[in-house]
Amino acid sequence: MSSRWVEINCSLSLCRKVFAILKQKNPRQLPDKIDIIAYRENSRKCSIAKENKRLGMKDDDRDWVAHFDHPFLMTPHICIKQDFLFFPFDVPTRKKKYQGKAAPYWKYCIGNWILIEATVHELSHYVHIGHGKDFFKIYYKFLSQMAQVVISGEFYYWYSIQHQSTKR
């Protein structure tokens, strides 16, 4: 396995960890199972790839780094672009009035924080479709929970806590 895929798999495991933590904190708001996968152009799971292919469009859309799909009779999933998983660097979610304006360099986010933010954003779409007021309420709720978990240090030893609780 190339080092690029090692990085991508590490980022995917971090995103899955974010889902597991939020699922534990909000058991009724999130699904029991969700697949978090690296986006591939001709993926059978990704409905955006199917839709683009059906419409004759090329999968060259630069406007997104991740998207949430909940296809009929299938497990919901989040597809995240491979280059974003390899080098996580982007501007966090902004309200509509700030979109389209150039973001200053200090508003960019890199590393674990942007992976957490992107995962929280896509998980919020399970509860609310679109980017209205209700979406931002749930988005900020999930994001503040994750910030609290990271700042408290619980995020970094969360798997060991889960492992200990199953042994008892």
Residues covered by each model-derived region:
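Walker B catalytic acidic pair
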Residues: 122
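Active-site-proximal or metal-binding-adjacent scaffold patches in catalytic folds
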Residues: 1-117, 126-168
